[in-house]
Amino acid sequence: MNVLVAKTANDAERIAYTLIKERISGKHDFVLGLATGSTPVGMYQMFKQDALDCSHVTSVNLDEYIGLSPEHPQSYNRFMKDRLFDEVPFKQSHLPQGDAPDPQAEAARYEDLVRKLGVDLQLLGIGENGHIAFNEPGTALDAKTHVTELTESTREANRRFFDRLEDVPTHAITMGLDTIMNAREIVLVATGERKAEAVQHMIESVPTVDWPATILQAHPGVTVVLDGAAASRCAESLQARGQEAATRFFTIRD
């Protein structure tokens, strides 16, 4: 696990975007795993500002709420269209179908699709309870794409996107931890003090279902990009491992 610590959240986003841009530009047919939520929004803005050519890129998203149609204003399908796809065309874009009549069958279909495509790089965020995608604490480390019930803390964290907590869906279809681990490369971005405890466990704890992101320690190609606040609880362990500041390796441009 390579950990890069930037001075600011914007710098962390720029570093992650630069990594993704380099990988996309270096391969003719590329499969990029995308995420939703607040973490990737700044990076998607950089995609648009640069008019990044993604015409050779196929995207697969991590998850989707169950019960929301693709046109629903709070669906992840709509999130991706509004924040990226409408301005940056991709070769193909795939998300789970949240309003599928049989969510279990849809999860199996999506698992098969992702496996057949083969993800070159997966972008991740991390929840305050250590979840990645919607793999909540207690999720089996070998889980495939599945239907999951969202914890109250996750629903509360996502409440800001809805009018009321009651409107936040209770279930989702999500790539499983094993599905995510099959990506050739993973870039995880975390910023802000609220993520510090989860980041500390991800880096310092042994792999455990109590903190799902700890499984990433077993992946050979993980880059974690943090700002100072997110790294604040693991500064000593990073120093002991000889990690350097990310700004020594990247030129940060406004």
Swiss-Prot record:
Pfam families: Glucosamine_iso. CDD domains: GlcN6P_deaminase (cd01399). Keywords: Carbohydrate metabolism, Hydrolase. InterPro entries: Glc/Gal-6P_isomerase, Glucosamine6P_isomerase, Glucosamine6P_isomerase_CS, NagB/RpiA_transferase-like. One of its GO terms (cellular component) is cytoplasm. The keyword Hydrolase applies. GO terms for molecular function: glucosamine-6-phosphate deaminase activity; identical protein binding. Its EC number is 3.5.99.6. Pathway: Amino-sugar metabolism; N-acetylneuraminate degradation; D-fructose 6-phosphate from N-acetylneuraminate: step 5/5. The keyword Lyase does not apply. One of its GO terms (biological process) is carbohydrate metabolic process. It catalyses: alpha-D-glucosamine 6-phosphate + H2O = beta-D-fructose 6-phosphate + NH4(+). The active site is at residues 63, 129, 131, 136. SUPFAM superfamilies: NagB/RpiA/CoA transferase-like (SSF100950). NCBIfam families: nagB. Belongs to the glucosamine/galactosamine-6-phosphate isomerase family. NagB subfamily. Catalyzes the reversible isomerization-deamination of glucosamine 6-phosphate (GlcN6P) to form fructose 6-phosphate (Fru6P) and ammonium ion. This is Glucosamine-6-phosphate deaminase. It comes from Exiguobacterium sp. (strain ATCC BAA-1283 / AT1b). The gene is nagB.
